Amino acid sequence: MAGSVNKVILVGNLGADPEIRRLNSGEPVVNIRIATSESWRDKNSGERKEKTEWHNVVIFNEGIAKVAEQYLKKGMKVYVEGQLQTRKWQDQTGADKYTTEVVLQRFRGELQMLDGRQGEGGQVGGYSGGGSSRGSDFGQSGPNESFNRGGGAPRGGGGGGSSRELDDEIPF
């Protein structure tokens, strides 16, 4: 096999406000829990069923951590892109435990807030961690733009925009 891919994309709702802590170096680390749900109709009873999965997300990317700390609140709908990582730890009795988390590393990952701000519809925006071509200027553009400074059109389509906001120009 030539290579492998470890990429996770989640769209869900925050189960609580972000938990922020600091490393000894002063860098922020943010923990969030995201709920994703799927629903279906039971073939036998015709009853609607729903299953919710809870995902632990850890943000090491300083720019994304600042955005999470300032703007994320319980119940908000978010888009998160990161890597799956499993870590081993020991509980108080010395038994080995394992935790699997979605991790946004220092120079990788993406966070977008999908709920409107103060009654606005559509996508609020987000932040992509990455190389030097991506800035840490969250909040300096309009409500329907996400931060993907690598070039091209903004990511995400948003919703609730009017037809006059649409750009008819082809992005390539």
From Swiss-Prot:
Disordered as annotated region, ranges: 114-172
SUPFAM superfamilies for the chain: Nucleic acid-binding proteins
Any single GO CC term annotated in Swiss-Prot or TrEMBL for this entry: nucleoid
Domain SSB: 5-111
UniProt cross-references to InterPro entries, sorted A to Z: NA-bd_OB-fold (IPR012340), Primosome_PriB/ssb (IPR000424), ssDNA-bd (IPR011344)
Chain span(s) of sequence motif Important for interaction with partner proteins: 167-172
Bias (Gly residues) ranges: 119-133, 149-162
Swiss-Prot/TrEMBL keywords: DNA damage, DNA recombination, DNA repair, DNA replication, DNA-binding
Gene Ontology terms: biological process: DNA recombination; DNA repair; DNA replication
Gene3D superfamilies: Nucleic acid-binding proteins (2.40.50.140)
Pfam families reported for this sequence: SSB
Domain of life where this protein originates: Bacteria
Keyword Transmembrane: no
A molecular function GO annotation: single-stranded DNA binding
The protein's assembly and partners: Homotetramer.
Protein task: Plays an important role in DNA replication, recombination and repair. Binds to ssDNA and to an array of partner proteins to recruit them to their sites of action during DNA metabolism.
UniProt name for this protein: Single-stranded DNA-binding protein
Chain's gene name: ssb
